[in-house]
Amino acid sequence: MYCVKYDVALVSEKFQLVAFHKKMDDELHYETSVIPIHFNDQVIPFSNQASHLGLVRSAEHGNLVSIMERLAAHRRQLFSLLPAGLAFHHCGNPAANIRVQHIYCLPVLMSGLASLVLSKAEIKVISNYYKTNLIKQMKLLHRTPDPAIYFLAGTLPAEAQLHLRQFTLFNMICHLKQNILNKVAVSSLSVSYYKSTSWFHQIRYLCQQYGLFDPLIMLNNPPSKGHFKDQCRSKIYEYWHKKLTSEA
């Protein structure tokens, strides 16, 4: 019906099917091999991973494949700026290097990650990679304490950068009153499950962590984008400043 309404042509050669299951067991093998899916008299094979909207979804490795794709894209973007003065032998200003990295490279690293439900281990992979890049750009020792790295760089850790983008995405959903995502958010947050791992419940945990209003309240009364962004930025900066200062 969607294809007929919007005049969309489906090409079987471009289809990619990925089967997700909690355990890679015989049941998944049965679903993918014994029950094939046909389109235009052709069998659509199942893949271990597929790309959608710039993100790679994997049936075996969770979000790690998408994260590694973002790290590789960030590395390519960073290397493309080396001739502009970021290379070590250019002896460029570390502060300028950090600023250029923040403007041109950080968005590439964080692109799409805010929409994923990341585990603590996956967030740690991103944080360690980002911290290592800061150390190299500022020419610091590898054992430099975290507070010194982020205070000298004048930037937030990768985890905080990710939280900022998650709040921005959630605020956008709050203003989409008739959108299916808004309805799913209200439905998900109205029923509270213990240790729920959904994306919207992660937003609720982040609101509690930073002392923000409950996300269900914001869905019913969406704050203005500018005010909400300033409030989130202020709360996140305050939280991480106290955390890093206490660790120093």
Language-model region placement:
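Catalytic palm subdomain of template-directed nucleic-acid polymerases
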Residues: 1-4, 22-27, 59-63
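Short, charged alpha-helical motifs in flexible N/C-terminal segments and linkers
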Residues: 7, 16, 132-194
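Short, conserved micro-motifs composed of acidic
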Residues: 8-48, 69
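Charged boundary/loop elements
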Residues: 13, 111, 116, 173-248
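Short amphipathic alpha-helical coiled-coil/interface segments
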Residues: 74, 126-137, 203, 236
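Acidic, serine/threonine/proline-rich low-complexity intrinsically disordered regions
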Residues: 116-124
